[in-house]
């Protein structure tokens, strides 16, 4: 009879434990009793400090810890040793286990200062993996996945015919095509529902971005495979940095995290804007939107008017080392990249600031040796203080030039593409505030002291202004005052300006070349290579003219324009019904005019023109929405190599003409070959059918089918004359009186 529990001896108990080994069952079915330890993390790598410095260290550490979750000072335990010094680690309790996971994911390996780097682990992980036997003592080399070659993200640049690509969005489809000049475009890829809002190329053409309710997706390579994903719920706006290193996304809805953090952490919760690192695919920092002041409503009530979105919310310096945003009326915050820390830990306070713009290129000012980035800004009249335009050097934050302005209604800042000039377009009102006029204040940034030239010969308001890319000429459009309630669009004037020639070769003062009156134009579109400009009337219901201008015409120059650096010539005027957009290809050889269904639904599609205005093709596309050319990165040729190409351009032109002729011959040959193939197929089919008919006749016992011989012409038939007589017969005649 087995002994009862009460009669068991101490020895029996020990024998039972020794005889039966439960270790394998415990390892397989062990129940974790962590009792809330999932919300704890252990932070190692902290500085060793005395007891009196511990509260200060905890407060400093708390700022880091709260970027990924929520914790408190009393939830941080930092043990001390016998000497009253900290041990270099701490235990931290977060509000939820998800926040603890986010801390290990985002804070592990981040620097606390120059000498200390944080190591963050979950307390349960330390307990789980720190036990004896949980980690193999023998090293097992990791399995290395076989190398997989990635797609060449700039493969389109190697096209043997140097063709350009464009993306076209129509209906629910997005396609990428090769431009084939006057032939139908050649499709590269075409996909349904590729985007929900729009598509956009990155500035150097490496990526094609699509926008979805879940976020932004980047595509690239010969077959446009997925490259990067940037989750941002309900994103509606995006912008790349100039060198494609960073991406900004914006949504009107603040981010809400429903489940455990993924790519987005608790730091992004409640924010509208995220700045991403494209290489890593991770967010650098997130922000809440600053809404611009709402325009006044019909009754002067600004509170009832719809608030305007400030976009781009962040503006990038040319070298991508800084990004800045404006708090309207108060300050400009400048952040250093890639750490996204505030420059000098403080924003630049500028009372009343209304707008700012970075120089699009790094500028070398005369007498300045250190590297700098420039930004321009303006403030309105405040009390008795005049309006002001300023030029600031970054990172020093030194204001290197200011200019006072009076009777100002509005200001627009226009940088030349190389940063050599910044044109300040000033709309001034009369003392009675009943009329407006515009004058231009042009800052010559590269010259000593940054002199300012004033162009005050304009009598009307400037509604559009554009610098020549990599040049020193500009075009503007002016209009007079429009009576209220008038449905007819106002007449405009197009003015071309160029600098005077000087003996030193430097650009002289800006002078008017010519003004074209009684136009309806409202858009200016320079060729990316300069010299040629398209001036068009877009988004109009009555006028659709597109003018192609050449500012370096090689013909005879008018006597009154001899001293100016321009020879203006209208090459051609076209019309495109319902035109809404004008886009140059990156080489400056072709121009696309398009009519988008986003604006109207009449005759949607696009036309392709040469730079001189010759229309190559016209494509009517149902539900056409968008056409965007793929940008090209800057050339790798040196300036000397580029000069050599220009010198030998005539020789290259002959080669290109021969290639074009050969391409046409190939196309014609292909047509002939196709027709020959069809004829041969028809002949073979006819022969086969005849053989089948003969076999059937033979089976049925019918005589062989003989084709009737062709009728032979009778002798003398060549001299015969055929006379035809047409006889008309009236069957019925009726007369009807029409009122």
Swiss-Prot record:
Which Gene3D superfamilies is this protein grouped with?
Answer: 3.30.70.330, YVTN repeat-like/Quinoprotein amine dehydrogenase (2.130.10.10)
Location of the RRM domain? 39-125
Q: Which UniProt keywords apply?
A: Cytoplasm, Initiation factor, Protein biosynthesis, Repeat, RNA-binding, WD repeat
Name where the WD repeats lie. Answer: 191-229, 231-288, 457-498, 516-559, 574-612
Pfam families from the UniProt entry: eIF2A, RRM_1
Alphabetically, the GO molecular function entries are: RNA binding; translation initiation factor activity; translation initiation factor binding
InterPro entries (alphabetical): EIF3B, eIF3B_RRM, Nucleotide-bd_a/b_plait_sf, RBD_domain_sf, RRM_dom, TIF_beta_prop-like, WD40/YVTN_repeat-like_dom_sf
Query: What family classification does the UniProt entry report for this protein?
Result: Belongs to the eIF-3 subunit B family.
Full protein name: Eukaryotic translation initiation factor 3 subunit B
The organism named in the record is Coccidioides immitis (strain RS) (Valley fever fungus)
Q: What is the lineage of its organism?
A: Eukaryota, Fungi, Dikarya, Ascomycota, Pezizomycotina
